[in-house]
């Protein structure tokens, strides 16, 4: 078994994308490869085949390998629920919530889980491609590190260092990061990859020559800036839009402090007939056909945030004028009458009034519901698939008019009697073409174009592998993976 790790000089340097690209590039060559990220901090997550929870980036990387996501691919997931605290998920299961200081002392236990998962993957896959987190040169985080060089040292693997030239200062990023590492860690870095380059490569060549002479390490390649690449963001909210046709549906999503699984909206962002707007703090909700309340890792505090921004008043006005309102997961809970958190799972224990638009209430319980599901929307009997990640148990008469009939016999969500309000626990439902089209028609869009989001994602994964093939040193990459040259 061989392990190759990708680390970055900064967050958003391109680590997730490069690991996805390498996984598909190796898979194309018949290599049995698996992705791995020791520790991830993100509110975007996916449900695995073994009934756990991992970061969505690792789920996409699994797709690049034609594998089902598994909890061993991301053994430690941290989901922030306050500015200083996070839910700690080990091997796909929430084990506790702790602040940053407490977690620092917990890292030795977390490292055991990381090494256990890495060992298990190594028993089934000859090549493991690992994604680091943030930067390996964060001085204050280096003690007991499990996400970057601490892991690389523990499993004795080579490292590639990637940097984003589009931000500027790429040579300072690479050299500075290298020099902040220990001598043994520096020796692990086997080469550099420069990401998001625009322009004439000949103008960059003197800098590449200097970098190799200065460090004694090769530049493995320079990846170009890709304008229309659309894969789920690991954590940051992706607000890029594609070109739209003349007649579009206006959809608004209020951005909440603890918004979770905002990748739910990627299919809408890419849809040619949808104008998707994310509205931040202090901004008024503009006229819209559909407002969607997103998932939340802290429903009661985000409800308070909505009200403090005056968005509750804007939503009421939107409904008076005939607009449609949808809630997903935490957004569904907000549509009800009460949200109760007796155990203090998402903050201080207590209860908060919801919007009272659906006759139901939610109690947050310690046991989280994690499922991949299929079913049919009550709208048009459209096929839908998605996943549940929630701690809430919702009850009330509103559920008698369900939004989804699931194949496992359960009903999900609710609709208002007047048809204006719809809520569901299902994340990812817009990725189902039939369900997406049905929901857009419900919101008022005529002549809806069907868009296959899964096909778009697959296309972009293939494009990434093409970039590796064209722009990176393939023989060196294979050598670092313990493979013979082609």
Curated annotation (Swiss-Prot):
GO terms for biological process: cobalamin biosynthetic process. It comes from Pseudomonas syringae pv. syringae (strain B728a). NCBIfam families: cobQ (TIGR00313), PRK00784.1 (NF001989). Coiled coil: none annotated. Gene3D superfamilies: 3.40.50.880, P-loop containing nucleotide triphosphate hydrolases (3.40.50.300). This is Cobyric acid synthase. Residues 248-435 form the GATase cobBQ-type domain. InterPro entries: Class_I_gatase-like, CobQ/CobB/MinD/ParA_Nub-bd_dom, CobQ_GATase1, CobQ_N, CobQ_synth, GATase_3, P-loop_NTPase. The lineage of its organism: Bacteria, Pseudomonadati, Pseudomonadota, Gammaproteobacteria, Pseudomonadales. Pathway: Cofactor biosynthesis; adenosylcobalamin biosynthesis. Keywords: Cobalamin biosynthesis, Glutamine amidotransferase. Catalyzes amidations at positions B, D, E, and G on adenosylcobyrinic A,C-diamide. NH(2) groups are provided by glutamine, and one molecule of ATP is hydrogenolyzed for each amidation. It comes from the Bacteria.
């Amino acid at each position: 078994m061989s392990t190759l790790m990708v680390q970055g000089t900064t967050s958003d340097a391109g680590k997730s994308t490069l690991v996805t690209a390498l996984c598909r590039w190796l898979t194309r060559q018949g290599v049995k490869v698996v992705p791995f990220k020791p520790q991830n901090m993100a509110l975007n997550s996916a449900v695995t085949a073994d009934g756990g929870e991992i970061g969505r980036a690792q789920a996409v990387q699994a797709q690049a390998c034609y594998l089902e996501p598994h909890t061993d691919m991301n053994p430690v997931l941290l989901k922030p629920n306050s500015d200083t605290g996070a839910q700690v998920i080990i091997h796909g299961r929430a084990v506790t919530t702790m602040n940053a200081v407490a977690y620092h002392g917990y890292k030795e236990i977390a490292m055991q889980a990381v090494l256990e998962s890495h060992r298990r993957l190594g028993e089934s896959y000859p090549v493991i491609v690992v994604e680091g987190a943030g930067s390996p040169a964060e001085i204050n985080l280096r003690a007991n590190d499990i996400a970057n060089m601490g892991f690389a040292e523990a499993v004795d693997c080579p490292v590639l260092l990637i940097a984003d030239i589009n931000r500027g200062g790429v040579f300072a990023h690479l050299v500075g990061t290298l020099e902040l590492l220990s001598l043994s860690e520096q020796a692990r870095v086997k080469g550099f990859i420069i990401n998001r380059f625009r322009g004439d490569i000949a103008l960059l060549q003197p800098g590449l020559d200097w970098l190799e002479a200065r460090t004694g390490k090769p530049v493995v390649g320079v990846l170009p800036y890709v304008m229309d690449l659309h894969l789920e963001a690991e954590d940051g909210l992706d607000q890029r839009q594609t070109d739209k046709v003349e007649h579009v549906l206006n959809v608004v999503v209020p951005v909440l402090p603890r918004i979770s699984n905002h990748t739910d909206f990627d299919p809408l962002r890419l849809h040619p007939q949808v104008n998707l707007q994310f509205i931040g703090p202090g901004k008024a909700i503009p006229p819209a056909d559909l407002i969607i309340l997103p998932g939340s890792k802290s429903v009661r505090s985000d409800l308070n945030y909505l009200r403090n921004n005056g968005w509750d008043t804007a939503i009421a006005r939107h409904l008076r004028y005939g607009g449609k309102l949808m809630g997903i997961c935490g957004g569904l809970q907000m549509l009800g009458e009460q949200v109760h958190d007796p155990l203090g799972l998402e903050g201080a224990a207590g209860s908060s009034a919801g919007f009272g638009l659906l006759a139901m209430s939610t109690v947050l319980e310690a046991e989280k519901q994690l499922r991949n599901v299929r079913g049919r929307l009550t709208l048009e009997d459209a096929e839908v698939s998605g996943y549940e990640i929630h701690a809430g148990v919702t009850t009330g008469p509103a559920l008698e008019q369900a939004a989804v009939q699931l194949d496992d016999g359960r009903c999900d969500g609710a609709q208002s009697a007047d048809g204006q309000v719809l809520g569901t626990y299902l994340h990812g439902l817009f990725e189902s073409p039939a369900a997406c089209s049905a929901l857009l028609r419900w919101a008022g869009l005529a002549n809806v174009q069907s868009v296959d989001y899964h096909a778009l994602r697959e296309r972009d994964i293939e494009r990434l592998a093409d970039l590796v093939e064209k722009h990176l040193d393939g023989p060196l990459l294979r050598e670092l993976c313990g493979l013979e040259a082609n």
